UniProtKB/Swiss-Prot annotation:
Residues 221-321 form the Fe2OG dioxygenase domain. GO terms for biological process: gibberellin biosynthetic process. It holds the Pfam family 2OG-FeII_Oxy. The active site is at R312. It is an enzyme of class 1 (oxidoreductase). It catalyses: gibberellin A12 + 2 2-oxoglutarate + 3 O2 + H(+) = gibberellin A9 + 2 succinate + 3 CO2 + 2 H2O; gibberellin A12 + 3 2-oxoglutarate + 3 O2 = gibberellin A25 + 3 succinate + 3 CO2 + H2O + H(+); gibberellin A53 + 2 2-oxoglutarate + 3 O2 + H(+) = gibberellin A20 + 2 succinate + 3 CO2 + 2 H2O. This is Gibberellin 20 oxidase 3.
Length: 380
């Protein structure tokens, strides 16, 4: 069966027709059949990756120290977070409490999905306008500047855990027998990330001078997204990008990288890298949390590069508010601004998600463009 699936895939893209999508990105076949990547994956010269990229200085935050009750450790953690989040929104979390064996199992299980035949992965195909499922380079959604990657995304709502296991159930429904352990591992991982995200929200609340539990309570009921990112080897990495320049529209991203590296952040008018640290999670502020802070904390432009030697794997947990919860900053973060101005209108996450899924390709202007779109929509 696997041989038959592969045999039906043309040299550039497979044309496996479905109701939702008409094509699939298959890097293995592209590398086998051509010395050049298709034009759809070639980025403009001004966006092509640079070979001269220096590491970004990002603080290491001792989360266990912050939570220990030691006022000195808590003060240092909030100071470091505030400085980083005000400038570029990126920091590293160490002593995070996530079991290293869970991380090992999570990486181990990625190959069972992403190295399966294209027709097998298609069982979990992501539908247009939805955030769950398999996506191959956004082929079908976009026709140029395609990212050299595959993803598998899951919705995660912690309050549903009592009634169902959202990640595990999605895998079971879409992939069927043979993926039980796969579903269990990523269900456990998503739950661990949700727990970690709420601890980080306590830290962010204190660093902003609001009540410590304010943001934690805001996100206790949430509609988050958990994503597996797989970046295959690329014969011409100097022409392509694994993920194009963008700011995350979500509230908070918790990323774990394998040892390969590829994350770059645009700070001080230049691209800088964040090298892998197996014992730390990379955390960055997203557009929605920037709005919650009235622009005080920054959502920064970043991208992922690829290479010709090794595949790259990452896990990203995107913390998002409950869909219909109104996103607006606490009064302390409005009154502290000159003339008490609001930088962004009230909105809900479901509105913002719809905008990024159906109307706008995320970049550095997503939140501003959404604000304009929202005002125009409300004027009718």
């Amino acid at each position: 069966m696997a041989t038959e699936c592969i045999a039906t895939v043309p040299q550039i893209f497979s044309e496996n027709k479905t109701k939702e999508d008409s094509s699939i990105f298959d890097a293995k076949l592209l590398n086998q059949h051509s010395h050049h990547i298709p034009q759809q994956f070639v980025w403009p010269d001004h966006e092509k990756p640079s070979t001269d990229v220096q590491p970004l200085q990002v603080p290491l935050i001792d989360l266990a120290g912050f939570l220990s009750g030691d006022s000195c450790l808590a003060s240092e953690a909030t100071r470091l977070v505030s400085k980083a989040a005000t400038k570029h929104g990126f920091f590293l979390i160490t002593n995070h409490g996530v079991d290293e064996s869970l991380l090992s199992r999570a990486y181990l299980h990625m190959d069972s999905f992403f190295k399966a035949p294209a027709c097998e992965k298609q069982k979990a195909q992501r539908k247009w306008g939805e955030s769950s499922g398999y996506a191959s380079s956004f082929v079908g959604r976009f026709s140029s500047k395609l990212p050299w990657k595959e993803t598998l995304s899951f919705k995660f709502s912690p309050e549903e855990k009592i009634h169902s296991q959202t990640v595990k159930d999605f895998v079971s429904k879409k992939m069927g027998d043979g993926y039980e352990d796969f579903g269990k591992v990523y269900q456990e991982y998503a739950e661990a990330m949700n727990t970690l995200s709420l601890k980080i929200m306590e830290l962010l609340g204190m660093s902003l001078g609001v009540e410590r539990r304010y943001f934690k309570e805001f996100f206790e009921d949430s509609d988050s997204i958990f994503r597996l990112n797989y970046y295959p080897q690329c014969k011409q990495p100097e022409l392509a990008l694994g993920t194009g320049p963008h700011c995350d529209p979500t509230s908070l991203t918790i990323l774990h990288q394998d040892q390969v590296g590829g994350l770059q952040v645009f700070v001080d008018n230049k691209w800088q890298s964040i090298p892998p640290n197996p014992h730390a999670f990379v955390v960055n502020i997203g557009d929605t949390f920037m709005a919650l802070t009235n622009g005080r904390y920054k959502s920064c432009l970043h991208r992922a590069v690829v290479n010709s030697e090794r595949e790259r794997k990452t896990f990203a947990f995107f913390l998002c508010p409950k869909g219909e919860k109104v996103v607006k900053p606490p009064e302390e973060l409005v009154n502290g601004v000159k003339s008490g101005e609001r930088k962004y209108p009230d909105f809900t996450w479901s509105m913002f998600l719809e905008f990024t899924q159906k109307h706008y390709r995320a970049d550095m202007n997503t939140l501003d463009e959404f604000s304009i779109w929202l005002k125009n929509r409300r004027s009718f």
